[in-house]
Amino acid sequence: DLHRLIRRQRQMCIRDSNYNMPLATVPEIYELIVSDLKKAETMVPANYTKEPYARNGVNIAVSQGAVKATLAYVYMAMAGWPLNKGTEYYQLAAAKAKEVIDAAKKGTYYYKLLPDYKQVYSMEYNKNNPEVLLGVYYNLGIDALTNAPLADFLADYAYGGGGWGDTNGEIKFWYDFPKGSRKDASYFPKIILKNETQLRDWWEDPNPEAPRVVVAPCFMKKVETTTGEEFDYTNPKISMNQNGEKTHQIIRLAEVYCWYAEAVGRSKTGSITEAVNLLNEVRNRANGSVVAERDIYKTTMSYDDLAEAAYKEHGWEIAGYYWGNIATRARDMFRMNRIKDHFEYRKLNPEIEVAPGVFRKEAVSVSGTWNDSKMYLPRPFVDSSINCLLYTSPSPRD
């Protein structure tokens, strides 16, 4: 993921120490990634049977399915910005994703969707989630900052003495997010503020004499307790601290369904029926019992509509899970070159009616003129101070 965040990098193997090595181009970096993944496909098994490579009935080490799924998303990235390889690579992505899906359906891989979305990031399935193709597993006993349960909710929340407020959800994205079990499990459905016991909606600002600094929806996928019990947003005294042991879910099977459907749509080849059926599996679970309607995506939809539907479903499916996911919504926006459009929208920062007569807008404003350098982070000084070549500013397409 580093090349997508900081443009070009030095292409070095772990044994190398040549700090004068010139920067590799984006195509060269992708060539190395694809080459390594193709080799890995032939080197790792479909399933492990012995510890520490397998535990609790799931693969702990990287499996064949995980490699194939990663390669599918790499092809998706190469098809989009900045390489813009297009149809051929969307076809490669669809084919590789289908290998994973078919193997799971046949039982070669054990992967399957959990029946209820609230189970996906639960403690119940933290160590034995059959949907996770690639995960990083942690143990709270090492007392290391692994999951950071306090990072994603606001400082004025009651839980754990208050969150860090590192992130919060965007109001427009929350507003557009389809109602259902997935939304209820992704965001705090209600909140309790410090020194209160009352459940409130996130948009409430009860004290005009001391208004809240940030009023925004917050995600609760990373929250966890110190006791291992499920997080309960109705309990303001629930035990929490900065350390956690929730698994970093890097790739899930539901994402592979979405990638396959999007790749079929963008390549305009392949079975719309199969892609739609898989996408409906994802959406039906997302709706849960909250939304009665089923199979909202129809086999009569166009390839273009299928691609956009799958793109959006993936964004909702992994919303707020920037911590460990290989393909966050920001990375999807990156490969579709849509961050600039979102930048312009955020500059406008319109008020949104989140409830009858209640309007809210983002607390953090955006200003300036767009250029593609805003897609990237600056290179770390610790690296650029060693290698002066890192001061250069190449084209993102180089």
Predicted regions and their residues:
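Active-site-proximal region of nucleotide-activated glycan assembly enzymes
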Residues: A261
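Short, cationic motifs built from Arg/Lys/His that form the positively charged side of catalytic pockets
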Residues: R7-R10, R252, R283-A286, H314, ...
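Intrinsically disordered and other compositionally biased segments
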Residues: M12-C13, N325, D332, P396
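Residue-level signal for pocket-adjacent positions within structured domains
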Residues: D16, T328, D372
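Structured, solvent-exposed acidic/aromatic patches
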Residues: D1, R8-Q11, R15-D152, I238-L253, ...
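C-terminal structured "cap/appendage" subdomains that terminate the fold
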Residues: L279-R283, N287-K347
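Elongated scaffold/linker segments in the mid-to-C-terminal portions of large proteins
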Residues: A95, E99-Y257, R266, F334-S393, ...
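Acidic side chains
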Residues: D1-H3, D36, G180, T247, ...
